[in-house]
Amino acid sequence: MSKNFINLYTFAGVICSTYRLPLPRLLEPLSMVLVLTIGWIIFLSSFIPVHFLLKGHDKLRKNLERCLVELICSFFVASWTGVVKYHGPRPSMRPKQVFVANHTSMIDFIILEQMTAFAVIMQKHPGWVGLLQSTILESVGCIWFNRSEAKDREIVTKKLRDHVLGVDNNPLLIFPEGTCVNNHYTVMFKKGAFELGCSVCPVAIKYNKIFVDAFWNSKKQSFTMHLLQLMTSWAVVCDVWYLEPQNIRPGESPIEFAERVRDIISTRAGLKKVPWDGYLKYSRPSPKHRERKQQSFAESMLRRLEEK
């Protein structure tokens, strides 16, 4: 089953074409900011009363907050002129399942969130993104961690296990690569999502670079500038596949399970698997590690020369 979501600007484009209005003027960055501003006004004027006035009605409050988070994410996608095609059944809320996806940009979360209010595990960010994490996204059960804090790993692991067992919790979403990759490759998946003792639901995301490259290089560009780049492009075109749930096989280790799921996602999205650790983006290898690798490479080259 596939479902097309045509956002506000796609609809506006049809109107402009019908009535011969100047489409390029409509797509100016100011218009994109206006759409997002309207979205925030609608969201905040609804979210604040719901969050503070319905504290005694937890189930109703959670359902309304979930819908409002999906709404603001839809406005974000509309501000990029996003054209997203979803393939497969909509994710359901049930215990003992976790969704895993390849990771290109923080907008992956927004694109998936407009379809279903996932609780995501995410690195803590500074600035306005961090403010959203500690306020609005807390309402859907998102879990934060800090790569530099070793003790965070144990705390996060416990939170993950508790979350997947909850009946009324939002579906849990994890990006097991641990970093943004350029949507040509998939790097090694961390095993944490694959040792929770639950079903793993793969999600494959593939961007079409016809109008803009959705890859976010956090080392070179702030997320604010990344959003502005998307908002000043013609469109963000993307396909999302919700794939068949997978379970660990008898005798299969969590690492082997992770590799099998990575293979499923890579095949569906047309991405190349590479044996790289995404965390190397955030830390330099030690001199001893480099020396061992150099020594190993030199020995392999000498063996090849001797064979010739």
Model segments located where?
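Structural signal for hydrophobic/aromatic residues that build the beta-strand cores
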Residues: 33, 76, 84-86, 97-112, ...
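Short amphipathic alpha-helical molecular recognition features
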Residues: 56-68, 91, 101-104, 112, ...
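Short amphipathic alpha-helical interaction elements and helix-loop-helix interfaces
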Residues: 21, 39, 43, 78, ...
